[in-house]
From Swiss-Prot:
GO terms for molecular function: enzyme activator activity; enzyme binding; zinc ion binding. Keywords: Differentiation, Metal-binding, Nucleus, Spermatogenesis, Zinc, Zinc-finger. It comes from Mus musculus (Mouse). This is DNA (cytosine-5)-methyltransferase 3-like. Expressed in testis, thymus, ovary, and heart. A zinc finger (GATA-type) spans 86-116.
Length: 421
């Protein structure tokens, strides 16, 4: 079974079904889906599925109530309390809002933790924290080829049933609670239209003014169409599986434009439409006859040409990266034009400074992953930058890749073993 320490051995032919459609239909809609899903998933035996669907029949003693998160099962089973009145993450009864993915509540501190962890990914392409409670440590990895979610041992044992983690760990292939056609596993009940719920939760509870796009079901995801300005990011897109080497008409597309001086709206409309627009200042040490601010203004101009129509519902993302060349005034201007604050990304391994970039983007998760720098940290970073005449392209590519990982929730990706740069 795949975990953060154990690579997945599951067959990558599992078919993903439209679970939102099944969840919003009749109460019996899961029955035909169960049969269809099992037939289309030969790597997953029926008895393996039963393991994660069963709730523990072990009786709970009313005279010895448990503590901590163990209270969740006790309150639901013994005290008959609605699980919506209990925080799924910590077990407190001080519920602030609803959990967006599963039936249950969230207290205020856990709500903040959930928002911060929602779109954080590790280098292996999977989410960094548990999908339910946002804890780290050793996690079960969903082995559906189109899923990036992980779950902690404690959540599956408490919410599905004691011993569930051991049974999952013994399975050759495990598919998670958001991918299975069965909406209930023990106390864990997937919400209907959970992608809508997730967007509404982020837009309502998030600290920033920028809304996110609803994540896209795997079977609806389309190949991404990218416009890359000033720098070619084809290697990054291939490493993420968005572009295939020698890709035909079925793969993603990339339009690279190095000099946009004479580009006008009709050019962009002819090349497009696009799902992602990327731009950056020139790398440190590069010979260039234009000031760094020129790249920002040109990026903003081209971005206006590429924006979808206002009534369009398709996800559209943009990202502008500064190789720490913009002055303080330029940074303020960029924030005003792009209408979002910058985030500073650092690649520090041990005590060795590798690279850093400032990023303005509407891609979700960036602000929670990279906290603002203190003035002392900013001064140290600038000193490190001045000491390097030129940053290696692979190190820049790694930072770009980390920014684009959340887009796997929106667009089709192809190669399963393409993540390392």
């Amino acid at each position: 079974m795949g975990s953060r320490e154990t690579p997945s051995s599951c067959s990558k032919t599992l078919e993903t079904l439209d679970l939102e459609t099944s969840d919003s239909s009749s109460p019996d809609a899961d029955s035909p889906l169960e049969e269809q899903w099992l037939k289309s998933s030969p790597a997953l035996k029926e008895d393996s599925v039963d393991v994660v669907l069963e709730d523990c029949k072990e009786p709970l003693s009313p005279s010895s109530p448990p503590t901590g998160r163990e209270m969740i099962r006790y309150e639901v089973k013994v005290n008959r309390r609605s699980i919506e009145d209990i925080c799924l993450c910590c077990g407190t009864l001080q519920v602030y809002t609803r959990h967006p993915l599963f039936e249950g509540g969230l207290c205020a501190p856990c709500k903040d933790k959930f928002l911060e962890s929602l779109f954080l990914y590790d280098d292996d392409g999977h989410q960094s924290y548990c999908t339910i409670c946002c804890s780290g440590g050793t996690l079960f990895i969903c082995e559906s080829p189109d899923c990036t979610r992980c779950y902690c041992f404690e959540c599956v044992d408490i919410l599905v049933g004691p011993g569930t983690s051991e049974r999952i760990n013994a399975m050759a292939c495990w598919v998670c609670f958001l991918c299975l056609p069965f909406s209930r596993s023990g106390l864990l009940q997937r919400r209907k239209r959970w992608r809508h719920q997730l967007k509404a939760f982020h837009d309502q509870e998030g600290a920033g003014p920028m809304e996110i796009y609803k994540t896209v079901s795997a079977w609806k995801r389309q190949p991404v169409r990218v416009l890359s300005l000033f720098r070619n990011i084809d290697k990054v897109l291939k490493s993420l599986g968005f572009l295939e080497s020698g890709s035909g008409s079925g793969g993603g597309t990339l339009k690279y434009v190095e000099d946009v001086t004479n580009v006008v709206r009709r050019d962009v409309e002819k090349w497009g439409p696009f799902d992602l627009v990327y731009g950056s200042t020139q790398p440190l040490g590069s010979s260039c006859d234009r000031c760094p601010g020129w790249y920002m203004f040109q990026f903003h101009r081209i971005l206006q040409y590429a924006l979808p129509r206002q009534e369009s519902q398709r996800p559209f993302f943009w990202i502008f990266m500064d190789n720490l060349l913009l002055t303080e005034d330029d940074q303020e201007t960029t924030t005003r034009f792009l209408q979002t604050e910058a985030v500073t990304l650092q690649d520090v391994r041990g005590r060795d400074y590798q690279n850093a970039m400032r990023v303005w983007s509407n891609i979700p998760g960036l602000k929670s992953k990279h906290a603002p720098l203190t003035p002392k940290e900013e001064e140290y970073l600038q000193a490190q930058v001045r000491s390097r005449s030129k940053l290696d392209a692979p190190k820049v590519d790694l930072l770009v890749k980390n920014c684009l990982l959340p887009l796997r929730e929106y667009f089709k990706y192809f190669s399963q073993n393409s993540l390392p740069l």
